[in-house]
Amino acid sequence: MKILFVAAEGAPFSKTGGLGDVIGALPKSLVKAGHEVAVILPYYDMVEAKFGNQIEDVLHFEVSVGWRRQYCGIKKTVLNGVTFYFIDNQYYFFRGHVYGDFDDGERFAFFQLAAIEAMERIDFIPDLLHVHDYHTAMIPFLLKEKYRWIQAYEDIETVLTIHNLEFQGQFSEGMLGDLFGVGFERYADGTLRWNNCLNWMKAGILYANRVSTVSPSYAHEIMTSQFGCNLDQILKMESGKVSGIVNGIDADLYNPQTDALLDYHFNQEDLSGKAKNKAKLQERVGLPVRADVPLVGIVSRLTRQKGFDVVVESLHHILQEDVQIVLLGTGDPAFEGAFSWFAQIYPDKLSTNITFDVKLAQEIYAACDLFLMPSRFEPCGLSQMMAMRYGTLPLVHEVGGLRDTVRAFNPIEGSGTGFSFDNLSPYWLNWTFQTALDLYRNHPDIWRNLQKQAMESDFSWDTACKSYLDLYHSLVN
């Protein structure tokens, strides 16, 4: 099968979050499974700086963006068997960052038009075209409404993956003519209109042949008013083509037996290296080196979406216990300030690190006993899977991908891979935290068994790849 991915970011070239991880990993697994895979990405200035000498020029042409004719260069490289094509236009993509400009609508309108028009020129007409989030969600609409006259594109099947429904691409309806060069019929009849705006995500949901999300629970949640971000009724209407597939993690990269960022290696049969990493981390972040105290890790953006309003409200109560917490992250200044204040009050119990440090993050995943992740909503989440890979048990709010990946501790069977609570409140966070502390202190054999189960969980991309192939084969015979 010929499969083409079109996305706004993709590791290792450009990455701001989980979308970049998916584009870096899923195509590689599909190639291993025997398929021909290509990816189209914007050619950002950070790609030029880091990988420019590995990328070759292929061709160039002009794209009509409304009444304007814009330069479009095509560049190319091959990595892990995947052919990466880059759309080059320095005006749109040499901004020093991926998102956040006032003209993001124009930038990604150009990108989508260029990606479609590039397919014939690079001689890669896919059986299946997989687009991601709002930045590329107009492509299924454009294929059926603007480019339907191109015979080579007639049989292309499309999949839209929603990584985060909060970001929908809502713009003025004038964009249809001014940028995309199409008429207003589909806006006037309500197909593309939402809240009196042009909604790219709605267009993708309605026009793609299949819609996937990054976990089965999130696929269900976005059809409710609580999580549907005002598109729940549209998703319910299209529910027959909506499904969820849990993202994977790179099992080779996140491997406690070989991780180059760790001082000591270990496996599920011998956790002595994990204990040494714990002592090393305690020393590094300025906490007393104690093997007996439960060490709790947090690696996150400090935002309300991640549940940190509830964490801050619970923190004084939690720190009354004989525990240690090491936090790594940046975000809302109010939360940054709260954690810094608590670290001054409890210097032997809380280490606050308001920064981003890849090595420290890896050490937290590997060295801690518990990993706190009480997100208000979480489409998939990767941190909980990384933590489990290293025998660090997650304590999570039961939503989205957290519900699908963390098996809550069952005291009757002594089974599970972590701890979870259903109602996001200080009471239930504290109650679940007490359950975990009791198990850690008084039932070490059960704790050890949970660690083993967590480390044996299969979150590899090869497993996720099989689910995506089932989805693709439902469209392409």
UniProtKB/Swiss-Prot annotation:
Entry keyword annotation includes Glycosyltransferase: yes
InterPro entries cross-referenced by the UniProt entry: Glyco_trans_1, GS/SS, Starch_synth_cat_dom
Signal peptide (from-to): none
Keywords, sorted A to Z: Glycogen biosynthesis, Glycosyltransferase, Transferase
Molecular-function annotations in GO: alpha-1,4-glucan glucosyltransferase (ADP-glucose donor) activity; alpha-1,4-glucan glucosyltransferase (UDP-glucose donor) activity
Enzyme class: transferase
Record-linked SUPFAM superfamilies: UDP-Glycosyltransferase/glycogen phosphorylase (SSF53756)
E.C. designation(s): 2.4.1.21
GO BP: glycogen biosynthetic process
Pathway terms, separated by semicolons: Glycan biosynthesis; glycogen biosynthesis
Residues binding ADP-alpha-D-glucose, per UniProt: K15
Catalytic reaction annotation: [(1->4)-alpha-D-glucosyl](n) + ADP-alpha-D-glucose = [(1->4)-alpha-D-glucosyl](n+1) + ADP + H(+)
Function of the protein: Synthesizes alpha-1,4-glucan chains using ADP-glucose.
Family: Belongs to the glycosyltransferase 1 family. Bacterial/plant glycogen synthase subfamily.
Name of this chain's protein: Glycogen synthase
Naturally occurring in which organism (per UniProt): Streptococcus pneumoniae serotype 4 (strain ATCC BAA-334 / TIGR4)
